[in-house]
Amino acid sequence: MANVVVVGTQWGDEGKGKIVDWLSERADIVVRYQGGHNAGHTLVIDGVSYKLSLLPSGLVRGKLSIIGNGVVVDPHHFVAELKKLCDQGVKITPEILRIAENAPLILSLHRDLDAIRESGLSGLKIGTTKRGIGPAYEDKVGRRAIRVMDLAEKDTLMAKIERLLRHHNALRRGMGVAEIDSQALYDELMQVADKILPFMDCTWRLLDEGYREGKHILFEGAQGALLDNDFGTYPYVTSSNTVAGQACTGSGMGPGVIHYVLGIAKAYTTRVGEGPFPTEQINDIGEFLGTRGHEFGVVTGRKRRCGWFDAVLVRQMVAICGVQGIALTKLDVLDGLDEIKICIGYELDGRKIDYLPSSMGAQARVKPIYETLEGWKAKTAHTLRWEDLPVQAVKYIRYIEELINTKVALLSTSPEREDTILITDPFAN
């Protein structure tokens, strides 16, 4: 028995969807433990693309899939995404999909607040998806959130709504926005209550039972560790913890049940939205990586910023997340380049450093120190065996391993799940 956490080690979009899908075939249970529907991923199965942003990837494989308490759930999006998958022929029932009863809900007022803030009326622009994720987490921490279980308790729901609106209507008055009527919000929730409640469960008990029965549990992270609210490029981060440790608090399982942490990293670096990006290439290389790698957001369609592989950042996240192996993705995007650069350190105010400081000012001032490697002309795309990789590609991978202090466990050579070279099976530990 082994339970595996999958975590992105960059700013998200590392290719977690494909890797989770590949691993879910070996898993019995797949659980989402943080985030909301702000981070999407695409699964390609038998030539069919499935785009997910809230539902666990295991659903497409018919595995028991759980949305944990660490996830904020937009009930309207939940219903829409469920319908879209069902329309594609995926059979989804309450027997294979469960939602934590204590998961907070994203409401229309959260989306309103997110959009107003991001429009620039309130100062710093973070680059959010405007889907209400941050405001929903604020209400969770502020102990005023409406949770899934509240939909089943209609006799107390109105009182909880009124308490929530005392806070939000005060904000809306200050921003010059019309207040929300409590009955209107109650009616909004009642429209979806019957569609979401059949999936509600005490999910920590389900997971505990599965663990005691010796089932393989796969913890599916969203976004990337560099967007973590504590350890990311603050304030240009998300509103939840995205590091591997969140798998425990976001699911209701203790750290002793985790046996392997698999980090996901692209063979180069991308970022969506605002914030520091030391190795960003605003030039032909950046355009090449973006075009070859199809670097556009699944959820927003926004063009991703692109740059060279930053070993400093990945090594930092490997340490913070306790990563035991890396799944390296999109190696094939680098095919054909004459030379490839890797960031091996930074220069900050005239001195060399080997980590990214927490200070917003320092993060903006660091300059990357590069080492240049010879590229390769032969294709790595669709390669299925390690020994068939170009020599220079192998050297590139080995150097990355040396720099980030962990080994490559899986190598992805195309979006197709079959194009995966297994070096170390995370579930074998």
Curated annotation (Swiss-Prot):
It is an enzyme of class 6 (ligase). Its main location: cytoplasm. It comes from the Bacteria. It is found in: Cytoplasm. PROSITE patterns: ADENYLOSUCCIN_SYN_1 (PS01266), ADENYLOSUCCIN_SYN_2 (PS00513). Pathway: Purine metabolism; AMP biosynthesis via de novo pathway; AMP from IMP: step 1/2. One of its GO terms (cellular component) is cytoplasm. Belongs to the adenylosuccinate synthetase family. GO terms for molecular function: adenylosuccinate synthase activity; GTP binding; magnesium ion binding. Its EC number is 6.3.4.4. The gene is purA. Binds 1 Mg(2+) ion per subunit. Plays an important role in the de novo pathway of purine nucleotide biosynthesis. Catalyzes the first committed step in the biosynthesis of AMP from IMP. This is Adenylosuccinate synthetase. It catalyses: IMP + L-aspartate + GTP = N(6)-(1,2-dicarboxyethyl)-AMP + GDP + phosphate + 2 H(+). Its cofactor is Mg(2+). The active site is at D13 (proton acceptor), H41 (proton donor). Homodimer. GO terms for biological process: 'de novo' AMP biosynthetic process; IMP metabolic process. It comes from Bartonella tribocorum (strain CIP 105476 / IBS 506). Substrate binds at V298, V299, T300, G301, R302, K303, R304. GTP binds at residues 12-18, 40-42, 304, 330-332, 412-414. IMP binds at D13, E14, G15, K16, N38, A39, G40, H41, T129, R143, Q223, T238, R302.
